[in-house]
Amino acid sequence: MHTGGETSACKPSSVRLAPSFSFHAAGLQMAGQMSHSHQQYSDRHQQNLNDQQASALPYNDQTPQPLPNQRRMPQTFRDPATAPLRKLSVDLIKTYKHINEVYYAKKKRRHQQGQGDDSSHKKERKVYNDGYDDDNYDYIVKNGEKWMDRYEIDSLIGKGSFGQVVKAYDRVEQEWVAIKIIKNKKAFLNQAQIEVRLLELMNKHDTEMKYYIVHLKRHFMFRNHLCLVFEMLSYNLYDLLRNTNFRGVSLNLTRKFAQQMCTALLFLATPELSIIHCDLKPENILLCNPKRSAIKIVDFGSSCQLGQRIYQYIQSRFYRSPEVLLGTPYDLAIDMWSLGCILVEMHTGEPLFSGANEVDQMSKIVEVLGIPPAHILDQAPKARKFFEKMPEGTWNLKKTKDGKKEYKPPGTRKLHNILGVENGGPGGRRAGESGHTVADYLKFKDVILRMLDYDAKTRIQPYYALQHSFFKKTADEGTNTSNSVSTSPAMEQSQSSGTTSSTSSSSGGSSGTSNSGRARSDPTHQHRHSGGHFTTAVAMDCETHSPQVRQQFPPGWTVPEAPTQVTIETHPVQETTFHVPPSQKNVPHHHGNGSHHHHHHHHHHHGQHILSNRTRTRIYNSPSTSSSTQDSMDIGNSHHSMTSLSSSTTSSSTSSSSTGNQGNQAYQNRPVAANTLDFGQNGTLDVNLTVYSNPRQETGITGHPDYQYSANTGPGHYVTEGQLTMRQGIDREDSPMTGVCVQQSPVASS
């Protein structure tokens, strides 16, 4: 018994794990205090806990058994740096980086293995198009390469979805050109062939390059790429804005751009062309010279003719017209909408409607212009993408799904405030500047609102836009457009010789007398009459406006009344005779619903001017913004060439003043710094006279619309030698681009 007792005492585990009957056998009376079934359940439960802990935490046999409360606590821990909670919280970025590294490492290995397994694949990539193209169908440009013993490639200056543009030197013509290299793919080739056809058609009707369209010199196929050779141009208008730190250019310079663009759109609207550009934006309007205001429109890759519309998704979003957004039929008016957006952006420095998508774009348009008319939305296939129709038949703008973007109520973001009409311009930056009065801004706002008419049928047309008072100059205004006399494709001057008392009119196939040149690009031309008076423009004076029914060309080309003869001298030894219509009363304008009465005569002889060889005092009040690509004036000390004033007692006409007083040749021979636009020192963009006897000098000049003549509307304004000198000083200070420096960066012409 003693031995058994020792054995029992030495094995506490047997006592702990023994069932109740073993305690009875040992003489211990513990089982009587609890029921037999309860004891069995308790022992079974304890055994399960022990088994679970033993399997979860393997203990060393030599380790002492923990207390019951300690059995639930882990004895070993994972490295905190590898804990999932830490990886997905504090080290989340590191985790993602590691995932990316592993993913791309595997991808790179698979790519290398694939190339190793199929050596022909790598060889095929190398010799695509006999090694001349990359895998994106673009020609591999090599600087210094010579093409066809004619073109020496200088550098790549542009790239786009169409292909690439390179700067090259033409050794035959001895000039720099821009070559647009189309991708070696059928779809791009087909579209480029349309562009070539349209460019050739436009150049055919603009042989003197007067209408601000880029000149396509020639085209050819080279190594399976269609190549278009263009004249070399300078910066685009977006580059110009960027170099003003997006503060915008002056209203004077904006006016110059506006008139040239309207002239170009008038040219595109001629019946023989009827071309829609479809992608007007600052990037597609290029300066001809970094120190001049002359511009040209480029990139007709998306263009089409009126009867051959191909695409529905056209125009860059910021400049997309309502009819394109709404899916209704479009015509040439979409380019006028784009122009309105561009002009505001050029002056404010910021896009007028900068939508992130089409819904946002329409919402931003509605903020400024209000809800489109119901008759437009009722016919629009995509109206319900942007608007919802109320039970009473009106339309409201749809609320955004996320509700994050908040828009101002329709029509409450006024253009009046955007332009800063009464606050000194955008941001008050133009306060006190000459040419930025409230009256100037009211004219600008009015013409922009006419360009941004929702209804394409009543949206102002180029012909009428050119006659808006924004382009006119009054007796007290010296900063409006300059003395360009240039012709529109629809209304040309015919040649004539003799004195100012002789007038000849060319009907171009139609009979009758000429009454007006109102389709010409300078509708600001003021005319002398016997009393020495000239017409003055009031703030909202717009003699002809958008008609209710859209017309390609102005109504009434001929009238029975005899024209008034006016002489305007454009050179000390020359003068030009124009046909001026009799005075007419201004027709009051009701926006989008005006009625207009005008008489015009269509001249078909392009590029011909009526010149006579007599010296006369020159007329001062004739503003026009046309800037020739070849003819500009410097500000100097001598009075000669185009700015000279000849004193003549035989004429009582007032004189048209240029802002510089040295001839065009002097400007051409003057070295031009490549990185500056200081017009106060090197010339001015304010005024350019562009009627010459030498047809060669007319290259790059716009057309010249004449204004209606109205007697006794203002005092005569005569310019003396002293006044001209003072005028030159004013122009030096008010030069539209004085102080604007643009870093040299050649821009492709298309």
Curated annotation (Swiss-Prot):
**Would you tell me the Gene Ontology cellular component terms?**
nuclear speck; nucleus
Q: Tell where it localizes.
A: Nucleus; Nucleus speckle
The annotated regions of Low complexity compositional bias extend over 494-517, 622-659
- Keywords attached to this entry: ATP-binding, Kinase, Nucleotide-binding, Nucleus, Phosphoprotein, Serine/threonine-protein kinase, Transcription, Transcription regulation, Transferase, Tyrosine-protein kinase
Question: Which positions bind ATP?
Answer: 157-165, 180, 230-233
Q: What is its EC number?
A: 2.7.11.23, 2.7.12.1
Modifications the protein undergoes after translation, according to the UniProt entry: Autophosphorylated on tyrosine residues.
Active-site residues are 279 (proton acceptor)
Question: In what ranges is there compositional bias, type Basic residues?
Answer: 587-608
SUPFAM superfamilies assigned to the protein according to its UniProt record, in alphabetical order? Protein kinase-like (PK-like) (SSF56112)
Question: Which residue stretches belong to region Histidine-rich domain (HRD)?
Answer: 584-612
Q: Which reaction does it catalyse?
A: L-seryl-[protein] + ATP = O-phospho-L-seryl-[protein] + ADP + H(+); L-threonyl-[protein] + ATP = O-phospho-L-threonyl-[protein] + ADP + H(+); L-tyrosyl-[protein] + ATP = O-phospho-L-tyrosyl-[protein] + ADP + H(+); [DNA-directed RNA polymerase] + ATP = phospho-[DNA-directed RNA polymerase] + ADP + H(+)
Positions of the Protein kinase domain:
151-471
UniProt enzyme class: transferase
For this protein, the record's Gene3D superfamilies field holds: Phosphorylase Kinase, domain 1, Transferase(Phosphotransferase) domain 1
Q: Name one GO molecular function term.
A: protein tyrosine kinase activity
Q: Where is this motif: Bipartite nuclear localization signal?
A: 109-126
Q: Where is this region: Disordered?
A: 56-81, 104-129, 400-434, 477-531, 583-666, 731-750
Q: What is known of its domains?
A: The histidine-rich domain (HRD) region is intrinsically disordered and promotes the formation of phase-separated liquid droplets that enhance its ability to phosphorylate the CTD (C-terminal domain) of the large subunit of RNA polymerase II (RNA Pol II).
What does the UniProt function comment say about this protein? Answer: Dual-specificity kinase which possesses both serine/threonine and tyrosine kinase activities. Plays an important role in double-strand breaks (DSBs) repair following DNA damage. Mechanistically, phosphorylates RNF169 and increases its ability to block accumulation of TP53BP1 at the DSB sites thereby promoting homologous recombination repair (HRR).
Q: To which protein family does this belong?
A: Belongs to the protein kinase superfamily. CMGC Ser/Thr protein kinase family. MNB/DYRK subfamily.
PANTHER family registered for this protein in UniProt: DUAL SPECIFICITY PROTEIN KINASE, DUAL SPECIFICITY TYROSINE-PHOSPHORYLATION-REGULATED KINASE 1A
- The name this protein carries in UniProt is Dual specificity tyrosine-phosphorylation-regulated kinase 1A
Which organism is the protein's source?
Answer: Xenopus laevis
Gene responsible for this protein: dyrk1a
